[in-house]
Structures are given as C-alpha cells and as structure tokens.
Amino acid sequence: GIALTVDGAEFRTYARQVLDQASLLEERYKNAKPRKQLCSVSTQHYMFAVEAFVEMIESTKSDEYEFTIRETRTKDIINQVANMLSEIGIIYLSDFNKDVIGKLLREKHLEFHPLFRAPLHVFISRDNPLAGKKKVTMDDLKPFPFIQYEQGEEGSFFFAEEAVWPEYSPKQINVTDRATILNF
C-alpha cells in the first residue's frame, strides 16, 4: 500500500481546510440575499445630529437594518470611530480646541470634515425672561445656572461641547445626557 509522509499528511490537512472554507464561501454567496444595512454614529449631544439620524432611518428602503446612535463624550466619540464601533463621529471644532482635537484625530488616523458653521446660541424656555430678547449677553446669563456636559475624568476644556464659558458661574450643573437639560 501507499503511506503519506509527514509532509504529505500535513498538506492533506491544510487542503481539506481550504476546501471546507471554499465550500462555506460558495454556500454563503451562492444564493445571497441583500445583507442587512448597518450604520453607527457617535455624536456629541446635538439635536441636529439626532434629527439627521432619524431622517436617514426614515429614508432607508432596506427591509433589514440595524442603526445605532450614541450620544456621548468627545473623547469617546473619537475612540469609537477609531475602533470602528461607529462609522461617523460628530464633534464640535473651534479655534480654541482645534489644535488639541486635531492632534488626537491625527494620532488615531482620522479625518475631520466640517458639516457647517453655527452661530453661538442659547437654549432657553419660552417662559424664561430672556426669551423675548433678540440678543443675549454673558451678563444676561449670570443669574441662570450654567449647564455643561460632563467629559469624564480625562476631559478637559478642549473636549467641552460648550462654545463659551462664563468667567464665573455660581450655579453650575453638569449633565451626561441631553434629556436632563429639558427639566431645567
């Protein structure tokens, strides 16, 4: 009879694995139906991002999809995109933070593409005494609490979502989610 050498037996083992994998590939793609549409977005706490996300879902024509939106801290957004947990990250970039955030993006091999330039704005209730004013100054805001998004232990002013900071605010509230703000 015939006997395989050690090398021959090893070759046969690898050849079987290759043939099995080829068979799995053929089975997978032979009668393939369209795959589930996937999309993950990590964003700072912006209403426009949520509205765009909802619009994207509503315009999806796929029968199967899995979409994820994560409202989170700036550094987490960058890490989630770098680690491919999200395809897109939405962050605020300004003259103040562009050097620090730009450096971090380069280190993570990520690119920043501006969506738009937004003027500064203040969110206030229609019952707020400032609601009727066309323009609001920092002095106008002094009697009110300054609400800011918490950026965690590693957070710094450079990762903040707020565009301006009061010189001094005796009333300060730190939040982690946008919904909490609606209660103030």
Identify the residue ranges that each predicted region occupies.
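Hydrophobic residues within well-ordered alpha-helices
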Residues: 5-8, 81-82, 141, 183-184
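Short, well-ordered beta-strand segments
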Residues: 38-44, 89, 123, 147
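Short beta-strand-centered segments that line the small-molecule binding cleft or hinge
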Residues: 54-59, 75-120, 124
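N-terminal winged-helix
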Residues: 16-20, 24-27, 32-80
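Basic, amphipathic "hinge/linker" alpha-helix immediately C-terminal to the N-terminal HTH DNA-binding motif
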Residues: 1-21
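Hydrophobic hinge/microswitch elements
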Residues: 73, 82-87, 92, 151-184
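Flexible hinge/capping segments at coil-to-helix
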Residues: 33, 104-120, 124-146
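Secondary-structure junction motif
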Residues: 49-55, 98, 130, 134, ...
